[in-house]
Design a protein with these regions (language model features):
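Non-catalytic regulatory/interaction regions at protein termini and inter-domain linkers
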Residues: 1-210
């Protein structure tokens, strides 16, 4: 079992093309990991992009402010982009993974013009709530375990949402679509290379049946 600081150190040290899946069971855990990841990037000549779907834009902005990120000023400086899932992941009820990938490339290119890299974080709850799980898997596998875009990315999954919508069976396929996996749950916190994760690791750490 890892101490909390190790997960923070891991996300802060992520490198371009790293593609990480992050399972959490509380909002506090989500914010602690994702905001540490983005804030460290902002301090290291990287832009930050965040896609909301579990919480609203206003909620995320307020949580970032509470964490210590000056949202308004960072947006004015052109270093922070916060988007809602509607129009990004799902548009007019459809998921077009090619369009999503192009969107990430556009943001990367925009930041590159300002001499910045890119750290991106996305809440993935919308795919479960809108029954777009097959499309989600296509998107995650299209990103590849090692990203084609030289950005660092964390795809964030609330375990409670997965359980409530009855999709625990896709947790392992989702893990395999990424290079690394972070688990924070009732059984503790762990970081794995995705090929080393077994069903019993997920069940022990998150206390779910896969």
């Amino acid at each position: 079992m890892l101490v909390r600081e190790e997960a923070i150190r891991f996300v802060e040290s992520m490198k371009p093309t790293d593609h990480v899946i992050f399972f959490y069971d509380t909002i506090e855990s989500k914010c602690r990991i994702l905001f540490s990841f983005l804030d460290n990037g902002l301090a290291s000549r990287k832009g930050a992009a965040y896609v909301c779907s579990e919480e609203s834009l206003e909620q995320i902005r307020n949580r970032m402010e509470s964490y210590g990120i000056d949202v308004n000023e960072t947006e004015k400086e052109g270093k922070l982009i916060i988007r809602n899932y509607d129009g990004w992941y799902i548009e007019n009820g459809e998921v077009e993974y090619v369009k999503i990938l192009a969107g990430w490339r556009d943001i990367y290119d925009k930041f590159q013009k300002g001499g910045l890299g890119l750290r991106g974080a996305g809440e993935m709850a919308c795919f479960f709530k809108h029954n777009k799980v097959k499309e989600l898997l296509r998107y995650e596998y299209a990103l590849h375990r090692v990203l084609d875009i030289p950005m660092e990315a964390i795809c964030a999954y609330n375990v409670n949402t997965i359980v409530e919508t009855g999709y625990t069976d896709i947790m392992m396929p989702l893990v395999r679509a990424h290079g690394w996996a972070i688990f924070t749950g009732p059984g503790g916190e762990m970081i794995y290379q995705s090929e080393n994760v077994e069903d019993y690791d997920i069940e022990r750490l998150l206390q779910v049946k896969v």
